[in-house]
Amino acid sequence: MWRWSSPPSRQKLSRDTSSNKEFSIKFYSVPQSKNLFILPYTTLYMQRYIYPVDLTEVEDELNIIVEKLKTSKAEAIREAIRHYAEELRGLEVVELRDVPKEQAKEEVKEFIKGKERVWADEIADALRLDLSLVNDILMELWSEGYVEPED
């Protein structure tokens, strides 16, 4: 635990080794005038998370990252987590439905009705169908003259 002690005349940072998970920061202030009331101190607690992780299988890659970015291993790991989280933030997970082909064909027909142009992946995402099934259905609908592929 880190404790920030700021007596009126000095500021001092001391380490309290009794806990590795909490920070305690105390700010002491002295009122400047008798009309102004300031609390004697404020305590702020912050939670730290420490995860023991075996990095044996990615040690070489981690060393390359550390050399190229000129940073510590801990900071390289933090940055990799931030990068991965940012990449996943925009993704949407689509759970596919298992429907018979004829039902899927009717749903595709209904979906494209009134639309001038639509992509196969849009249909698959909107109806939560497998993309290969949608492509097969679109090929059938093309052979029936119901849809036309774009040039």
Curated annotation (Swiss-Prot):
Domain of life where this protein originates: Archaea
Protein name per the record: Uncharacterized protein AF_0084
